[in-house]
Amino acid sequence: MENLNRGGFDFDLCNRNNVLEKTGLRMKGFMKTGTTIVGVVYKGGVVLGADTRATEGPIVADKNCEKIHYIADNIYCCGAGTAADTESATALISSKLKLHKLSTGKQTRVITALTMLKQMLFKYQGHISAALILGGIDINGPSLHTIYPHGSTDQLPYVTMGSGSLAAMAVFEAKYKNDMTKEEAIALVAEAISSGIFNDLGSGSNVDVTVIEPSGVTVLRNYQTPNERKFRNNPYIFKQGTTPVLKQDIAPLSTKVVIEDIMMGQ
């Protein structure tokens, strides 16, 4: 009998999928998502930013969604990827950290949230479509982390993620400096998000900013609205005869009426 406990990766399912695809089965395609999320560390805290466009393929599903999620009183998280995955993942970790805080009686540390998120995403091997930027402040000071869908992480002074990340990173690389003030950090984050909005089709609408300081958190919802829609107060009214009639053809209308008697059975 064949030993089923052989080591290494088993390609049987891959071969099966190839056979099914050759017989005409349409395999599930890759889901393209779009977002621009950024974060930057300044002298006294952390500033997070995100756009507000949610898409369903080529369709704009929501023009003013929230992508900066609450984790703890001193920690927030930006999410890129599938909206349901980012919201569920952050809500789950937020509830676990609440229980952890009640158990320990101490302020939640950023590294605790980072560890919980990366362990959960690694366990699902990238099948949870959530690319996250975690920012917060604790006894170790302000910190900023990126968490990729497979569970890998980075800690940097400024980060970008999402389909508009390249445009946003170009702004950071050109204008970031050490020991920025809060006002400079907010302006830089807003410019980076705007760059993603105007250079990436998957990002759009408004700019959301969240400032995390030792004294508290400031949520600046719709901090900038670079794509504000304009509406006309009055409809277009054209005078009769404005458009010239080049050709006129009148055809007689003939109708044919057919009357049938239907005998009902007794």
From Swiss-Prot:
Q: Name one GO cellular component term.
A: nucleus
Name a single GO biological process.
Answer: proteasome-mediated ubiquitin-dependent protein catabolic process
Maturation propeptide residues: 1-34
EC numbers on record = 3.4.25.1
- Top enzyme class, one word, equals hydrolase
Listed SUPFAM superfamilies? N-terminal nucleophile aminohydrolases (Ntn hydrolases) (SSF56235)
This protein's UniProt keywords? Cytoplasm, Hydrolase, Nucleus, Protease, Proteasome, Threonine protease
Pfam families, A to Z? Pr_beta_C (PF12465), Proteasome (PF00227)
Q: List the active-site residues.
A: T35 (nucleophile)
Q: What does the record give as the reaction this protein catalyses? A: Cleavage of peptide bonds with very broad specificity
Q: Which GO terms describe its molecular function?
A: endopeptidase activity; threonine-type endopeptidase activity
Key word Nucleus present? yes
| CDD domains hit by this protein | proteasome_beta_type_7 (cd03763)
Job of this protein: The proteasome is a multicatalytic proteinase complex which is characterized by its ability to cleave peptides with Arg, Phe, Tyr, Leu, and Glu adjacent to the leaving group at neutral or slightly basic pH. The proteasome has an ATP-dependent proteolytic activity.
What PANTHER family does the annotation carry? METALLOPROTEASE TLDD, PROTEASOME SUBUNIT BETA TYPE-7
Q: How does it assemble?
A: The 26S proteasome consists of a 20S proteasome core and two 19S regulatory subunits. The 20S proteasome core is composed of 28 subunits that are arranged in four stacked rings, resulting in a barrel-shaped structure. The two end rings are each formed by seven alpha subunits, and the two central rings are each formed by seven beta subunits. The catalytic chamber with the active sites is on the inside of the barrel.
The UniProt family comment states: Belongs to the peptidase T1B family.
Q: What name does UniProt use for this protein? A: Proteasome subunit beta type-7
**Source species:** Dictyostelium discoideum
Which gene is transcribed and translated to give this protein? psmB7
